[in-house]
Amino acid sequence: MSYIPFPDISPELFSIELFGVTFALRWYALAYIAGLLIGWRLVLRMIRAERLWSFGPPMTEDQLERLLTWVILGVILGGRLGFVLFYQPAHYLAHPLDILKVWEGGMSFHGGFLGVMTALVAFCLKERISILPVADLLAAATPPGLFLGRIANFINAELWGRPTTLPWGVAFPGEAAQSCPGIEGICARHPSQIYEAGLEGI
């Protein structure tokens, strides 16, 4: 059976130790940062494009700057709480302080989405601006972040797909990825992160 070996890529770009605590910059964190910055620039360009708006853009550039802060909080808090509630509630109920250990990983796309939607609605109500046009702007600016996030999922060797005998199947590392009932030897799986990066992010 032909397959693609998983590339030797570290999930960490680099790490430093300060006062006995190791801080690492991971590809996943970089994907979040780059996705938010690219999305912000895209929305800014759309706001400035007068031809897009018959009656003016739905918010000002100053409001966009404030919205970015709300979105960042929504992504981080929603993503983390979503992971806690959806994937390991028993562990975090027994060890609640572990919720704060974001450097150990654990974010949820669904939680991040709900966090951003909550932040969007709260911000628009506070600023007295229409929710739907602002939601349209965010939706148009989201694909680059999704693309980068899925590429980071691939680098982390997580969220892989079903076993496959197709030649582009990837032999992901780890006991869970290699646990394929009925398959002896190397188990190749669909690189679903790459599929999703292309379908969601381009």
Curated annotation (Swiss-Prot):
Topology class, membrane: Multi-pass membrane protein
A Pfam family: LGT
Pathways involved: Protein modification; lipoprotein biosynthesis (diacylglyceryl transfer)
EC number(s) recorded for this UniProt protein: 2.5.1.145
UniProt superkingdom: Bacteria
Keywords: Cell inner membrane, Cell membrane, Membrane, Transferase, Transmembrane, Transmembrane helix
Transmembrane regions: 18-38, 67-87, 105-125, 129-149, 166-186
Main location: membrane
Compartmental location: Cell inner membrane
GO biological process, any: lipoprotein biosynthetic process
Gene Ontology MF: a single term: phosphatidylglycerol-prolipoprotein diacylglyceryl transferase activity
Matches recorded under InterPro entries: Lgt (IPR001640)
Gene Ontology annotations for the cellular component aspect, listed alphabetically: plasma membrane
General function of this protein: Catalyzes the transfer of the diacylglyceryl group from phosphatidylglycerol to the sulfhydryl group of the N-terminal cysteine of a prolipoprotein, the first step in the formation of mature lipoproteins.
Family under the similarity heading: Belongs to the Lgt family.
Name of the protein in question: Phosphatidylglycerol--prolipoprotein diacylglyceryl transferase
Organism name: Cereibacter sphaeroides
Upper taxonomic lineage: Bacteria, Pseudomonadati, Pseudomonadota, Alphaproteobacteria, Rhodobacterales
Gene: lgt
